Amino acid sequence: IATHTLPCRCKLCGKAFSRPWLLNGHIRTHTGEKPFSCQHCSRAFA
């Protein structure tokens, strides 16, 4: 039983999230964006 609301919905796949920042992180799975990089090896991460 869900006890909280999920007001933030992905326009691409319909998955719902409780917080906007969780949705923003999820959208990276669709765009392939990797905004964080390692200072030692320069490898990028989402």
Swiss-Prot record:
Primary location class: nucleus
Keywords, ordered alphabetically: DNA-binding, Metal-binding, Nucleus, Repeat, Zinc, Zinc-finger
Cellular component terms (Gene Ontology): nucleus
Segments forming C2H2-type zinc fingers: 1-4, 8-30, 36-46
Record localization: Nucleus
GO terms, molecular function: DNA-binding transcription factor activity, RNA polymerase II-specific; RNA polymerase II cis-regulatory region sequence-specific DNA binding; zinc ion binding
Superkingdom classification of source: Eukaryota
Family: Belongs to the snail C2H2-type zinc-finger protein family.
Entry protein name: Escargot/snail protein homolog
